[in-house]
């Protein structure tokens, strides 16, 4: 499936480049794992798509926090590659929105773990700004600060 029409559709959809960059950089990194390898640590990824070849329970399901937190898992079941490709196409906008929101929430969580609490910007410029402690001041003049 990974080298066929379904795999190409997945790669084309999820590895679409960011707009506006001077070079192509895919929105998401993809890792294809065989079912025998998909256990333990592999299940702790934030965003997972599982394809099941089966005639029962066909369709698309989106599950939050199935094996880890935060996590979005898409379960796509179909009797063959064409049916799974159909379910993927029918639901890819929902899947992309869910993954994007999951990534946004995780980035915010990570950024707010260690915030810069320097009151200098509030004292000097009268603004209150929140940014990660990992950011540093590049240039600091009388009326300008570049972080």
PLM regions: where:
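N-terminal targeting sequences that direct proteins away from the cytosol to non-cytosolic compartments
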Residues: 1-147
């Amino acid at each position: 499936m990974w080298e066929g029409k379904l795999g190409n559709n997945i790669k084309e959809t999820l590895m679409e480049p960011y707009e506006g960059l001077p070079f192509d950089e895919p929105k998401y990194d993809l890792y294809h794992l065989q079912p025998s390898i998909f256990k333990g640590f592999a299940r702790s990824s934030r965003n997972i798509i599982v394809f099941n070849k089966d005639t029962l329970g066909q369709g698309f399901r989106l599950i939050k926090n199935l094996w880890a937190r935060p996590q979005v898992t898409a379960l796509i079941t179909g009797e063959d590659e064409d049916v799974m490709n159909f379910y993927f196409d029918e639901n890819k906008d929902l899947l992309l929105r869910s993954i994007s929101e999951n990534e946004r929430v995780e980035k915010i969580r990570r950024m707010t773990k260690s915030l810069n609490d320097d009151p200098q910007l509030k004292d000097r410029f009268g603004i209150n700004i929140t940014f990660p402690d990992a950011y540093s001041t590049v240039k600091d003049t009388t009326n300008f600060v570049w972080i």
